[in-house]
Amino acid sequence: MIIQLHENQRGQVRLNSHHSESFPITNGVKQGCVLAPTLFSIFFSVMLKQAMEGLDEDEAVYIRYRLDGSLFNLRRLQAHTKTCEQIFRDLLFADDAALVAHTERALQCLTSCFAEAAQLFGLEVSLKKTEVLHQPAPREEYRLPHITIGETVLKSVHQFTYLGCTITSDAKIDREVDNRLAKANSAFGRLYKRVWRNKHLKRGTKISVYRAVVLTTLLYGSESWVTYRHHMRLLERFHQRCLRIILNIHWTDYVTNVEVLEQAEIPSIEAMLLKTQLRWAGHISRMEDHRLPKIALYGELSTGNRDRGAPKKRFKDILKKSLGTCHIDHCQWSTLAADRASWRHIVHQAASSFEESRKDHLREKRRRRKNREASAATPNVTFDCGRCGRACLSRIGLVSHMRACSRRGLPL
């Protein structure tokens, strides 16, 4: 029946009001057909299987993992009899494919086999869209990779966008955060006159639009972010600027950031990230054991070591800190996450409690700063001029006044 749906297909090209002569369509799937995604996935899987046949086992990336025991007990991965290894060479989504390998030679072999299999099945690799990214090990010098398809040398880049997220050669999210801020700022600016300055819309409606359009753009893919304090400052600064524009709060009004969040009835970016990352971790823990995200979370690369001294933070480190902040036991969190509804309720309560604690901390910090400023101020102390006897409130004022007195020739 599927074959009959695709037999004797013909098409035409329409340009303005003119149509070309009809021509037969002998390959491909129907555009807009509900079967097209499934059929292409099956076709692509068979092609990929053909491409990977005969490859050496060392031309791949291995992950050593162990699903029992505590996630944060890394010593459990040192057991040789209780750990498993998972091999993967490709990361697929629809018609996008990412090939991964540890060495340049292995990646060249993978790329050549993939291109040959694609040509065998009537597909063509887009050379303009295909790029090579090299992520060197810590303290290893960056070397420009040389990967070819046929006689064409593929472009080597330090960053590229895959599924909407920016991946860089230094394995940091600095550029991703910058891109998210730029896209969110663009989305916010396009609605400036239409929504934010529209006097006919209620404040609640504007906040709902801000949540649906701007925040979703800003926090796209943030479930797996490994953030540092400077990233959080950039995100919170943008969040506050947008809310102050929506609420029409000027800097001369002297409204604190906590009061802005309370007026908008919206949490901080830090609380949002805490909530989304805990929910994402619970979703991974409920996955089947053969799923790659779960294997990556509960395992580590079989090849290579982390840098000594101050290594880069991992998602596990962020997760452990978030669990501690929410007062959730590190050893029992996966058991709690097994029940989806219960875990969502726990995370929601924990995020709300964290936000209240954060606000109280900021209020107390501001109160202490005001007290220090009040105690440091000495309005009753004066500095008297030895020439004319005038009292100045500050030492620098006295110096300036004495200079003027000396020009007038007053005696000491």
Language model regions located:
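Short linear motifs embedded in intrinsically disordered, charge-biased segments
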Residues: Q4-L412
